[in-house]
């Protein structure tokens, strides 16, 4: 019996040992029932993940809530502006309130209007255009990347959000009498015609410029400009009409080839960005709905200088030109247009070769030249000797009429400044500060005039002299330049102090979008533009007329 019992116990012990070895992991605890290091590590990772996942959800929720509240608050502020100070003939202390007339509703004029304390002056804005146009995104509108209504803001809405009452007159300035301080304006409304004269103490000329044709025959009547919102509408209609006309001709027909050739003249930001937008429209939208026709479409960009975008760093210019070559945009530099005909343009390449280029649509996006009003104003003042624009001093005062007329924006010929929104914006904000300071000086002079205390008069005189000495000159700070070059890429030449940074590619494209959203005047415009970009991403461009 004893041997049998011993054998049974030994067999049971061996069986228990085997089962224990099978149930344990390779790395195991010496104590049965307790988790090993690997199990502890797995549970630790799971706990950390759950903790950060919950934190991420909370952060997303609070960020979304804060963003929604901010947008709602901004929309409420824009929709419910506070009560304005009404215009009056004088201040409470008896000082006469001066008349400030602003000609134009572009970047310079609107930047001035937004920055100025309009309760200090009787402000009148005169412009044939009753809205502000966000010009940096204008090249995106003809092909439907951005809707035209998304980049406009009514002048009356902007004026209503200022501290003091602002009068707006939908009219065009015709002439100025600098000696009498009067400006002649003419209505542009078809329903009501009038010509009237407005008196001013200060006149701000911010009438912009028009696209120059360099006196090339045939540009007017054959080319489409891209300066105003009406130009973008005309280009969209012309583009759609040309594509439909081309589709009615058989493949390999010379007329079909001509109609499907789109020529853009001008290698500045406007010309480059429109050419890029047009090629995007062909590659990303028409290729889906009209695949055969889209393969025959050709975009040609013509520039008279050796390279496009000459305000950018050379490395960025090279990047843009290489991208155009990849996207099959025919870039022709050192090419000057000599004649424009209804169906073709004649060019001179490298100063040697004459070439005829047939086109279905021609977009003219070259430099600027003064409008008729600016030319009339130049003729009134002998000191205005530059035919390219109004001459101003370093305080933005018009030469020959320094104490009463200012000029800002594209209508001026300011050496070293590009005719960009950035320059006009800074000029407008600077002028608002100057006008505020001038009113403060006038208030001190009025108090000095009405004071009988010699000590007080002496103190006020010192204060006046000090404030006059602090009327700084205009100091332009170049922040850089941005340009969209197609295929969801952009270039950015940024300047911060003495340092410069060059960005390109997708990151620069996101920066380009963010920068322009930040530059918009209202939260309404920001929302509409962001919605347009989102719509294009998911649904494609809407190019319907």
UniProtKB/Swiss-Prot annotation:
Q: Where in the cell is it found?
A: Mitochondrion intermembrane space
List UniProt keywords, sorted A-Z: FAD, Flavoprotein, Mitochondrion, NAD, Oxidoreductase, Transit peptide
Q: Which GO terms describe its molecular function?
A: NADH dehydrogenase activity; NADH:ubiquinone reductase (non-electrogenic) activity; oxidoreductase activity
Return the GO cellular component terms, semicolon-separated. Answer: mitochondrial intermembrane space; mitochondrion
> What Pfam families is this protein classified in?
NDH2_C, Pyr_redox_2
Residues annotated to bind NAD(+) = 260-296
Any single biological process term in GO: glycolytic fermentation to ethanol
User: Does this entry carry the keyword NAD?
Assistant: yes
Instruction: Kindly report, in one word, the top-level EC class recorded for this enzyme.
Output: oxidoreductase
- InterPro entries hit by this protein: FAD/NAD-bd_sf, FAD/NAD-binding_dom, NDH-2, NDH2-like_C
Q: Superkingdom, according to UniProt? A: Eukaryota
Presequence boundaries? 1-21
- In short, the EC number is 1.6.5.9
The similarity comment for this entry is: Belongs to the NADH dehydrogenase family.
Q: What does this protein do?
A: External NADH dehydrogenase required for optimum cellular growth with a number of nonfermentable carbon sources, including ethanol. With NDE1, performes the mitochondrial oxidation of cytosolic NADH under these growth conditions. Regulates the mitochondrial glycerol-3-phosphate dehydrogenase, GUT2, also involved in cytosolic NADH oxidation.
Its name, as the record gives it, is External NADH-ubiquinone oxidoreductase 2, mitochondrial
- What is the species of this protein? Saccharomyces cerevisiae (strain ATCC 204508 / S288c)
What gene is behind this protein?
NDE2
